[in-house]
């Protein structure tokens, strides 16, 4: 779910920046170095426009290790319905991957 939202957001940004109305799936794949650079540049451009400006903001760069870790995590995630510890109500989905919990309401 989180990856879907991220891809839709990136697709919208890439459509605006390229001025196109239709994209092939290959145009959105983050395995493409051109797309990686476009994402990084857009992210860093947006961060430069922060007001007031941050004094210690680091420049973002692409990390292959993190890409592999995220890909593995996204294919191995097992969703479970989460319940509130006191009320017992169903409160959303929890994905477990490599000992990390991701909670989506």
Curated annotation (Swiss-Prot):
Keyword terms, alphabetized: Calcium channel impairing toxin, Disulfide bond, Ion channel impairing toxin, Neurotoxin, Potassium channel impairing toxin, Secreted, Signal, Toxin
Organism superkingdom: Eukaryota
One example GO MF annotation: toxin activity
Tissue spec. comment: Expressed by the venom gland.
Post-translation changes: Contains 8 disulfide bonds.
InterPro entries found in the cross-reference section: CAP_sf
Subcellular location: Secreted
Signal peptide range: 1-22
Location, primary (coarse class): secreted
GO cellular component annotations of the record: extracellular region
Cited function: Blocks ryanodine receptors, and potassium channels.
Family: Belongs to the CRISP family.
Name the record gives this protein: Cysteine-rich venom protein VAR2
